[in-house]
Amino acid sequence: MSTLKSLLPLAAALNACAQANVQSSRVTVGSSCANDAAIIVPAGFCASIFADNLGRARYLAIAPNNDVYVSIEGTRPGQQAPLPAFIALRDTDHDGRADRIERVGSKGNTGIALRDGFLYVDQGEVITRYRMTADLVPASPPDTVVSGLPLNPGHRARNFVIAPDGSLYVNVGSPDNSCQVKDRALESPGKDPCEELSTRAGIWKFDARKLNQKFDPAARFATGARNSTGMAIGPDGQLYANTHGRDQLTENWPRIFPDSMYGHENPAESLLEVNRGDDFGWPYCFYSVAEKRLVDAPEYGGDGKKTTRCADKKPPLAIFPAHWAPLDLLFYTGSNFPKRYRNGVFITFHGSWNRMKGMQAGGKIIFQPLANGRPTGPFEIFADEFAGVPPAEINPARAKHRPVGLAVAPDGSLFVADDDGGRIYRITYTGKR
């Protein structure tokens, strides 16, 4: 049986689990959690604040000596004040909070990673790398690894992941919602073919060990993923990614989807298993929660049921509620958390803006159990209430904090970056073994 066919029933079965939750509890201030971060985590866990007010903190990398590096988004159109490429943090007195904070470079964006003595940094159109030393801050200017990466318009987040063999996988998000002739316009048809797929909405592969590479459509590794802001190499060496589903099914196609609840619940957000040549369907298809499969997009003649354009597209490995906006993806490799968390993946969700009024989803972190690269049950809410406002008031403008990047420290604690309040959380397990 082909991989594509074998995943179809799995994706359908997972749909029934997509709204699942587990019981969680608020951590109270105590001797094991002196600076409570006021988010919800499971019983036995402690969420504390490692650093605060850093600006638009995006993704994280942590060195073997516990130094923390966080990318700072500085590529937004209309950006006025100059921002650093990244911030370097050190806890010199070992009290659980950063006390040395250094701002380095200029014009950061999203991705950041440590590999083989280098710090790799996404700077929008380029990915650079700094040679690391024993000091917190690199002593020499960066070298260019890849240049010419598409940035504007549309999705600018440039997450990347480096495999053990040096392969550099780079997300290049779509420039628009669904490749319409007029983006996000009422009943505007889709461009057919969607020519932007040659340079956007996919994952590109380069070599992290080589300098001065140029972006090239021929380097595309996988396509049809609208915006894969989270990527990770699993324990099995496999590349995994998540991707954002499209928006505005009801708003742009009310004659096909007259019930506003349809656009509220569709399409699902997705976790993907990525191999060379994979096509995940965007913009021609979206994952219908109701049909439990990929269906034709309305821009390409779809009615919410047809699958004419989707038979050869690869379905997701797991699905999650619509418009939650998945960001980072992390396989837990530490020893601090209970053993069950070493068999699955953590995903941050930034929170929604286009669910129904009064029913937006705030930022959260989920845990998806996996075994041998396959889901073994429903996802669980691991950390919640980052927004810090009542549920009916949740929206991006009101949220106080929104989780983005994840990283595991040498002691097994989980670090989380927040790009609204500029906070870095540190989550540890202090419960019974």
Predicted regions and their residues:
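Blade-level signature of beta-propeller repeat domains, shared across WD40, Kelch, NHL, RCC1
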Residues: 407-433
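Surface loop/turn motifs at the tips and blade-to-blade linkers of beta-strand repeat domains
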Residues: 50-54, 102-107, 145-152, 219-223, ...
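Asp-box/WD-like beta-propeller blade repeats and closely related beta-sheet repeat scaffolds
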Residues: 100, 109, 115, 125-163, ...
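Residue-level detector of Asp-centered blade-edge/turn motifs that repeat once per structural unit
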Residues: 63-65, 114-116, 162-165, 233-236, ...
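Conserved beta-propeller blade signature
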Residues: 67-71, 118-121, 167-171, 238-242, ...
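Beta-propeller domain segments
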Residues: 21-41, 157, 174-216, 223-227, ...
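Acidic, glycine-anchored loop motifs typical of Ca2+
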Residues: 93-100, 136-137, 213
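Hydrophobic core register within WD40 beta-propeller blades
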Residues: 60, 112, 160, 228-231, ...
